[in-house]
Amino acid sequence: VATVCGTRRDFQGYDKAVETLKEAGVIVCENNKLAVHTAIRAIGLDFEEPVKEIRPKTTARIQKTDASEKLLELLSQKPRVINVGLKSFAEVIEAFGCDVVQYDWAPPAGGNVELIKVLNFLRSCREMDIDEANRSVIAKVVASQPVIKDVVPAKSVIKELNEGKVILHAGPPIRFENMPDPVQGSCVGAALFEGWAATEEEARKILASGEVTFIPCHHVKAVGPMGGITSANMPVFVVENQTDGNEAYCTMNEGIGKVLRFGAYSKEVVDRLLWMKDVLGPTLGRAIRSIGGLNVNPLVAKAIAMGDEFHQRNIAASLAFLKEVSPVITKMDMDEKDRYDVIKFLADTDQFFLNIMMATGKAVMDAARQVTDGTIVTAMCRNGVEFGIRISGMGDEWFTAPVNTPQGLYFTGYDGEDVCPDMGDSAITETFGVGGMAMIAAPAVTRFVGAGGYEDALRTSTEMTEITIDRNPNFIIPNWNFQGTCLGIDAR
């Protein structure tokens, strides 16, 4: 037995609701009183309505007051509505010509009951202790002093690369046979570069045989872009967080075109890697050592004010880096052609600073992981199959889920069907609070990364404040009213 609220003129469709209930076997009454009487009689009980006491009508004269302007407006104009909840309610109101705003809200954890229980537990269990631990994590990030110390062969700072044939890869752990094609292609390129094989066929045979050990970059204080493939003789940036004394490593950016990080392994790719090993790496290493290292924070603060967000756009920071090292390189005792090639490569490679930013983020967030409590995300990465995160209070444990496929611009003739799922350790930049977290700083590239424009960038960065707990005062964004970058992704 039921009643339906409303009238036949209601937008939601009174008659349709009544009809639907009747078709389901429901007795529909016109009002609650009849429904109660019907239900009582349906279970076999008698019901007598009590006699109501009739009282004489009393009247009183009241002083009429003028209605407020807002009240008259409410009665004389169409309503302006903010809808919280199901979007269909807003659509009905809009269909009748009323102004309506759909509030962007969703149930916690997507409505997953079990996850909501977990969230409620986290909020109630030692909440003050968790908040205090999170503040400690953030304090470490803000106080960090990352410095580019050197460029050296990876095997000289990562001991695991000296234990036979070893390849580092991006993301959480994965077996070679499960890697997507671009990552496998990067592994082939590394095998050719290291001289383990002379042909692609030989390289794939070695890689699939079990002879090569695969280790996530994150497990050895390193990060790698896209496929993240790093082998013993590849030069890496050494970034030291001088506040805590820990180091992190990342390969150098190869530029654009056919590159190892995207899975290419042609002679052109291998030759460039050899040049980076023999010329670019040693040259930058000498230059950086000669100036006693290069403080990263001033470069980031300068470049974010010039339109970089340090994941997709790095041109300002790359040129700022070139500005620091080029005077030294021009005075170094070296082959003139090599000198020209190094300067030209740095000038042409807009994304060169990305790898420095990645090593910086890794060094800073690894130091923050020394706080063994809390719920701050300290690493995010992808291997083409899984997306993995680490959390400050959870040690080295990986939490993984199926990885998404990026939405962006495609070359002519290609579409989403041709896309490889997301991969790379470069999301360490977002973990650090830049990259997509600071998209508002780089409106020039919003459409390239799949956003619609400035308003989308503003909305994205504003939304990020909802999942982070603080701002980084070291990196302020002028076109965001000089607010600091978002900081401290809270897993809660």
Name each region found by the language model.
Residues T3-T20:
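Glycine-rich, charge-decorated loop segments at or immediately adjacent to ligand/cofactor-binding or catalytic sites
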Residues V18-L21, F47-E48, L119-N120:
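Short, hinge-like loop/turn segments at secondary-structure boundaries
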